[in-house]
Each structure stands twice: as C-alpha cells, then as structure tokens.
From Swiss-Prot:
Organism: Leptosphaeria maculans (strain JN3 / isolate v23.1.3 / race Av1-4-5-6-7-8) (Blackleg fungus)
SUPFAM superfamilies named among the record's database cross-references: Zn2/Cys6 DNA-binding domain
A Pfam family hit: Zn_clus
Parts of the chain that traverse the membrane: none
Protein name: Abscisic acid cluster transcription factor abl7
Keyword Hydrolase: no
DNA-binding region: 13-40
Disulfide bridges in this chain: none
GO CC terms: nucleus
Molecular function as annotated in GO: DNA binding; DNA-binding transcription factor activity, RNA polymerase II-specific; zinc ion binding
The keyword Phosphoprotein appears for this protein: no
Length: 601
C-alpha cells in the first residue's frame, strides 16, 4: 500500500487526537491507527452530514405528488410505498381514504374529478404550481407550493369551492373584496399569504358543503401546514412583526370558521386565538387613527394612502375578529383579547369602570379609532362611504339604519358591556349606593339594546324577515338573547327596593316580548338552508337552553306559558336540523332535546 507523508497540515488524525498520541500524519493511515487497526480519519475527510432541515419533508412531498400524478394517469397503479416517518403517515392516510360519496358528474366519477391532475405543461395558474426544482430551497414560496401540490384538486373543483365560499360563507364572514382577491390570485407568483388565503377560502367552503365534506379535514390540514410554514419563516426574521399581511389574518379567521363548524369544542378556538394575536401585533384596531402601519400586497403604506376597498377590508377583518372574540366567550367568563378600549368604544357611563367601585371617579377618555363596516354594495363596488364611529352608533341620538354586519358589530359591543355588567355584580356589594350604580348601568344597556331591536323590527305580516342573509338572521336572533341576558343579570342582584322590584318586573315583560321575537326568527329559520346559517347561531341557541334551564324566566309568568312552549319547540327544531352540519349544535344531547319537548306537551 502506498503511503505518503502529508506535510501540508499539522493536524493529527481523529484517533490520535482522541487518544492524545503523536501522529506521524502518514496517509491514508498513520502508524498508530495501523497498529491498532482503527479507522484513520484526518480533518477535512469527515463524512458529509445528513440532509438539511426540511429536505426530507420536501422530498416526501414531491414523492406524494408524483404518486398522485401516476394514480391519475393509470387507475390500476397502486401506491404501495409507506413512509416510516410518523409525520408523513397522517397525510398519506388521508390521501388514500378520501373517497367522496357523491357521484353526480357523468361519465367520470367524483374521485377522478377531484384528484385529476393536469399534465406538466398545463398546471393551473391559481396557486397549484409544481414544486421548486431546488430540493433544499427553504423559502416559504417553495415550501407552500409543495404543500399545495400534496392535495391536487382539479381546476373545476377549485373554482366550485371558491364560488361556494362567496355563495354560502361570505355572508357570515364578509371580509373579502372579490375584485381585489381575483387580482391578487391572478398574479404569476402570488405572495405566500395570498396562497394561504386561497386555501382557507376552500377549507371554509368545504364546511358548508355536503359534496366536499369528505375532503374538508384534508384541506384544513393543508391550510394549517401552510400557515405554520409562513409563520415559522417570519419568526426567523427580526423585522417579521412589522410585515403582517392582511391576507394572513384573514386566513386564520376563515380557518376559525371551519374549526367552529367541524372541530371539537377544545379545538374550536385555536385559529381564532392566532388571528387575535396577529391583530394585536399589527395594531389593526388603530386603523382609523392614521397611525397603523400594515403591509398589504407587495408594498407597505400608511393607512391614509390606501384606497377605500383596502381600508374597508382591513376594518372588516378587525371587526370579524372582534365578533369572534365575543362569540367564543358567550358561555365562558373569559377576558376579551380585544377589549372595548382597543376599538375606542367609550361606555356611556363611568359606572362601567371597575375602579369606580374602589372610590375612583374617573371617566373613560378614549380616542375613537375605528369606524363600523360600510354596506355590502359600497364595499364590493369600492364606493367611498364615511361610516360613523362605534361610539356614534351607540349614541342615543343616532337612529340611522346600518348594514347587517355593522349591526352585528354594535350588538357584539353591547354584549361585551352586558358581560362586564354581570361581572361587576360579583365585585360590588349590596349597599344602596352600589344598587343605584347597578340600575343606572342596567337602564342604559336596556335602552341601547331596545334601540337596536326597534331598528331591526319588521312588520308582523312579513313571512321571512331576513330574506336570504344569514348575518341579518343572526342579528335578529341575538337582540332578544341580549335582553334575556340582562334579565338574568337583574335576577342575580340581591338588593332591591320596591321601585326596583317594579322595574325588574318590567324587564321580565320585555323578556317575554323578546322571546316572541326570537320565536318568530326561529320559525323563519326552518325555511332557511342549513348550509347558509351563521356559524355561531347554534352557539347562541345552546346559550338559550342554558338560560331556560337555570332561570326559567320566560316560564315564570302563567300568561307566557303558551308562547314559551312555542319558543322552545321552535328552538328544538332548528337545533335538530343543524346537528349534522354544525358541531356546536351537538352540545345539547338528544335526550335533553326530547325531554324539553316532552315537558311542554
């Protein structure tokens, strides 16, 4: 064996360095290693390390894509390769088990329709692009592209899902400007946040469809993976917190719609929490204060420089997050992630301040920062409309009618006040001074809610009071629910004068009227498509059953017994119709629903 003495380096081999011996540096094996029959490795000759982080995952994604392409071209081809990695097992299982039950397209089957993949020269230009040839590239563009490719939907299914979103989901989550969305998606290389938004739109649409119900969970996992990848890349950049795109927040909110519709209660608030954190990080609540800096599209501008459509889309995104924050806590005494102080809502009375009960006599002095959403026509047609601030909407002198979404925002703000009002009951004592403050707050809230009820009131002869608008139906149902919430709070107060007891009786009469209004809405819902019902309507219905079971305020008046029975029957029928569509409708067991109907016979 030829040996050479390497005089170019003074470094010993690894074995001699480990044993702290003098090395003669003879190649390919030094004398010490030859005697001990050890492997002689010099610095610079070390074996190359394994693949970099992300390379194996990208390789698996490419293999899955190739397998699906082969399966689409040859129906007899069988995917038999099984990854041992546990992280890849779940997506493979989903890719093999998705078999839609509906077969409405002839002669091709639904399976061929959904998983048909175009040839390499005719990939659709709407985000379904091939993987980057550079396997080790770790930019979020290539990573999200690989995510999209692992679930290959045909162009027809993609278009159908997006149309379903605007037909069924948009009315409950009106945050997308359709023309701007189409423009963003027609870009040759859309931004990662825009790609995530498109996935989230398809995922939320699947929750409102019987045809695509089977692929909803798969779409959810794909969207979640894309958003996680986007955020993991942002966290590596010190300037990432300043470049939150509005499409990023919208993606989490639409994913929250799917979670609330399909996921268990323990998982139903995950996406909403992520969206709320992003809203806080980018200070989206300061939008109308002209000091919010947020990236939109491919450039960053101040809020005053943007056109109405972009500004309105941001407002709507914030208000939807605000509504979700309130609605997720209708049954839990949790703190708000977006308190009223953030949106600039000033309570009409200093009695809402907990500090007031500690002897402080200060008024809220908040800068009004946010305007309520404009009408749908103004938003979609980009017609600049100067909407009032939330505090102006809540004012006593403002009786202007608002869009259903703006009305929903006002009701959510009122619900936050009602929840704070109830929490202060446990803080305050039972003295006469505290009782006066309690009833002052109570009267102000009841007046504000009654004003919203009057604005929404429809003629008695109207057979369908909300047409085909799920947001309008939800607001019609939520107003009487707020009245019942206040009546329940009044029932919790222990110290009452004779005058206050009389006022309390008046509120109970208002609760009876509210129950009649809610019965009317519920009976109209029976003619409403279950796939167009607001995602949080079943949650409010469940809250009604909690109220009825604990207090039975509606049933306490003998004259209201007949109306109460009609009310509960209508609620029961609506919940029964929604149990197969909305997860929250299943929170009341079947035996409880049956028992309610039996007791009212």
């Amino acid at each position: 064996m030829d040996t050479t003495h390497d005089r170019r380096t003074s470094l010993s081999c690894d074995e001699c360095r480990r044993r702290k011996l003098k090395c003669d540096r003879v190649r390919p094996q030094c004398g010490t290693c030859a005697l001990s029959e050890s492997e002689c490795v010099f610095p610079g000759d070390s074996r190359k390390r394994g693949p970099k982080k992300g390379q194996l995952q990208a390789l698996r994604a490419r293999i899955r894509t190739l397998e699906q392409q082969l399966a689409a071209k040859d129906a007899t081809w069988n995917m038999t390769y099984d990854f041992q990695d546990s992280t890849a097992a779940e997506p493979d299982e989903f890719s093999q088990c998705i078999q839609p039950n509906v077969n409405v397209f002839e002669p091709e089957s639904m399976e061929t329709l959904i998983f048909g993949i175009a040839s390499s020269t005719s990939w659709p230009k709407n985000g379904m692009t091939p993987l980057d040839p550079a396997l080790g590239a770790e930019s979020h563009d290539s990573h999200i592209s690989s995510t999209l490719s692992s679930l290959s939907l045909s162009a027809l299914v993609q278009a159908d899902l997006e149309q379903l979103f605007f037909d069924r989901v948009y009315q409950s989550a009106p945050i997308i400007h359709k023309a701007r969305y189409i423009t963003l998606m027609e870009q040759e290389d859309p931004l990662p946040a825009c790609v995530c938004l498109r996935l989230a739109i398809r995922t939320s649409a699947a929750a409102f469809s019987a045809r695509y119900h089977d692929i909803g969970e798969r779409l959810y996992l794909e969207t979640l993976q894309s958003l996680e990848s986007l955020e993991s890349n942002e966290h590596t950049l010190p300037w990432g917190a300043k470049n939150i795109q509005i499409e990023h927040i919208q993606s989490w909110l639409l994913l929250a719609v799917y979670e609330h519709m399909r996921m268990d209660k323990s998982q139903a608030s995950s996406a909403t929490s992520r969206a709320l954190r992003l809203v806080q990080r980018c200070r989206l609540g300061d939008l109308d204060a002209s000091d919010c800096l947020i990236q939109v599209g491919s450039h960053t501008t101040t809020a005053t420089e943007e056109d109405f459509a972009v500004m309105e889309e941001k407002r709507r995104t914030f208000w939807l997050a605000f509504c979700f924050d309130r609605l997720l806590n209708t049954r839990d005494d949790l703190n708000w992630a977006l308190p009223e102080e953030m949106v600039g809502f000033q309570h009409g009375h200093s009695l809402f301040s907990p500090g007031h009960f500690q002897g402080a006599s200060l008024m809220y002095d908040l800068q009004i920062r946010m305007r309520v959403p404009a009408s749908e026509a103004s938003f979609q047609h980009s017609q600049d409309t100067n909407m009032p601030l939330l505090s102006e909407v809540m004012g006593e002198g403002n009786d202007d009618s608002l869009s259903p979404f703006a009305t929903c925002v006002a009701l959510m703000a009122l619900y936050g006040c009602c929840a704070t009002h109830r929490r202060l009951v446990s803080i305050a004592g039972g003295s006469g001074n505290e009782s006066t403050k309690f009833w002052m707050r109570h009267n102000w809230l009841m007046s504000a809610i009654e004003k919203q009820r009057r604005l929404l009131q429809a003629p008695e002869s109207t057979p369908n009071i909300f047409g085909d608008d799920p947001m309008l139906a939800f607001t019609h149902f939520f107003v009487p629910t707020l009245i019942l919430h206040l009546v329940e709070t009044a029932d919790l107060w222990q110290w009452h004068s004779a005058e206050q007891e009389e006022l309390r009786s008046v509120y109970k009469q208002q609760a009876y009227i509210a129950a009649k209004d809610r019965t009317r809405v519920a009976e109209s819902l029976l003619c409403f498509s279950g796939f167009k019902v607001h995602p949080f309507l079943p949650t409010v219905l469940v809250r009604f059953f909690d109220f009825s079971g604990k207090r039975r305020i509606e049933m306490s008046d003998p004259d209201a017994t007949s109306e109460s029975r009609r009310n509960i029957r209508a609620m029961t029928k609506v919940l029964s119709l929604l149990r197969d569509i909305h997860r929250s409708a299943k929170e009341i067991p079947d035996d409880v629903l049956d028992g309610l109907e039996t007791t009212l016979l």
